[in-house]
Amino acid sequence: MELVFQWEENPQTAEQVFSLGQKAVALDDSQPTAHETLAYAYLGKKQHAQAIAEAERALSLDPNFADAYTTLADILSFAGRPEEAIRLVETAMRLNPCYPASYLWSLGHAYRLAGRYEEAIAALKRVLTRNPDHLTAHVLLAALYSGLGREAEARAEAAEILRVSPNYSLAVVRQRMPYQDPAELERILDGLRQAGLK
């Protein structure tokens, strides 16, 4: 996921990961982790169909690969298919009951896109219980609270965003969030703008 949101400072990193993922798949097409890595690399390039195909290939190679379920869920969420994403994250959580906070983020993101806002807030708060500095959990919460008219909470989340990443801005969100539907990206940006992010 760090690749998708380009948290790495070096802009060549995303291209290197993409290139290495392609090489890994070319060397051994039977490795599910290679396909999962390549799926995220395609998502980072906003090539949703290719990302879905690679994540599905990872799961066909290892149907018990819990992380690949959340990878596919993230891709489907960004592609506008949140209900499918929710089911996939639930499957991942059954396969890996000691799941990381990233699974909760994937669930919260999908809930938000499905219009299940209170469930999204609950999942994202659980992410922050595990990792108070989880940047994109704060981002989604700020946008959610703004959309629900909960201005004080939205502004508090915007302050947390800037605490975690002082240079974070709407321009960063526009560049890094790989939504297939431009209107969805605009909804996030509007919510963050209302929360006070510039």
Each predicted region: which residue ranges?
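Structural signature of tandem alpha-helical TPR/SEL1-like repeats
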Residues: W7-K23, G44-R57, F78-T91, A114-R126, ...
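TPR/TPR-like (Sel1-like) alpha-helical repeat modules
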Residues: S146-Y168
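TPR alpha-solenoid repeat register
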Residues: A34, A68, S102-Y103, A137, ...
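Residue-level recognition of tetratricopeptide repeat
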Residues: Q31, F65, Y99-P100, H134, ...
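Terminal, low-structured helical/coil segments at or just beyond the last alpha-helical repeat
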Residues: N167-K198
